[in-house]
């Protein structure tokens, strides 16, 4: 049995300076996705989060995490990211996005062509293709800073 929780996949929060979960905040993500759950979540900026989503319910067989979505905490809205390759072509994502100036940069590997870095705008939930790398896969992306 895959599902081991009593609630559907969702979001809870701990307010600043609080010691526990906010009992008045729970957002059911499966209600917004037709029963799909998420595998990972990363903070981007303010109350925007990038989620790695499964393509189908965990109660079905053959599920895979091949979609990205943006969750905004204030509104509780989940929006799938547009501008990425078709989910059936995506074979993987980088382990962790690089975040800078309010944008997330995610490595995307497909079954066609070379992997690429996509810049994701969380406000519009839009990805823009950047550089492609002549490789089979990109596990991560980052930025080197000079030491002072």
What function would you assign to each model-found segment?
Residues 15-18, 42-49, 93-104, 123-125, ...:
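Short, solvent-exposed coil/turn segments at beta-strand boundaries
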Residues 68-110:
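C-terminal hydrophobic structural anchor segments
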Residues 1-49, 53-56:
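Acidic, serine/threonine- and glycine-rich low-complexity intrinsically disordered segments
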């Amino acid at each position: 049995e895959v599902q081991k929780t009593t609630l559907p996949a969702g979001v809870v929060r701990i307010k600043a300076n609080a010691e526990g979960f906010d009992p008045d905040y729970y957002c059911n993500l499966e209600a917004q996705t037709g029963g799909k759950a998420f595998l990972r979540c990363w903070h981007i900026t303010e109350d925007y989060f990038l989620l790695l989503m499964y393509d189908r319910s965990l109660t079905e067989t053959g599920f895979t995490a091949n979609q990205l979505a943006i969750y905004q905490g204030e509104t509780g809205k989940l929006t799938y990211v547009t501008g990425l390759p078709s989910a059936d072509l995506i074979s993987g994502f980088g382990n962790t996005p690089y975040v800078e100036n309010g944008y997330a940069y995610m490595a995307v590997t497909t079954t066609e062509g070379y992997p690429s870095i996509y810049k994701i705008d969380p406000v519009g939930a839009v990805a823009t293709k950047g550089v492609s790398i002549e490789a089979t896969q990109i596990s991560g992306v980052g930025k080197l800073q000079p030491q002072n």
